[in-house]
Amino acid sequence: MHMKSIFILVSFLYFSFNANATQMGNVKGKRTVSLNNSVGTSIAKFFSNSPLEKFEGNSQSLQGTFTLNADQLEQSSGQIAFPVTSMKSGLSKRDDHMYGKDWLDAKAFPMISFDVKKFSGITIKKSDNSSVEFSATAEGTCTLKGSSKPTKAKIYVKYVFESENTKKRASGDLVMVDADFSVSLKDFNVLGKGDIIGTKVGENIDLDIKLFGNTN
């Protein structure tokens, strides 16, 4: 076979493969991911940093699903939520204040949620026969204390294809997500009492959310 013919054949095979591949390799279409403790314990950690006091806490009562659109990752979506009263800071008295009307008002607004509308700035970090990893910005709406505000979160997604090893944890493909973002308490009408916000409680609360799930 002449070199020119070989070049044409290789080029044809290359472009044929890539025409069928997506940003997630051979994964195609929409994949719905449900949180599953068998894969790992999903957790939302929150951090308050102020001049007089620093503290952190977490919720391990996350719920929700999200859909990864392998054909167009930008069009992925979903919702993650957790009860206000599941947030624990290590001090029960502080937690009781946090749940109160001046703060998160858990009685009137029992849930905190993040609705993902799309991904942007997607960068594929790894893609092979076992998994795909990518970073992106998840854009959507955070709802807290009855107020909904546009929010962006930096995310890192690891998508592991089903294998005999993964089946030992859960069926389907396994998905792990690490998300980081910050919320301004004032933006969500969380005012506290007196001048506590800005002195003993940070004006902005940082969140680090880790999600573990599997495809249906």
Regions found by a protein language model. Give the residues of each.
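Sec-dependent N-terminal signal peptides
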Residues: I6-F15
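N-terminal secretory signal peptides that target proteins for export/translocation
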Residues: M1-M3
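Low-complexity, acidic/polar, glycine-enriched regions of mature
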Residues: A21-N216
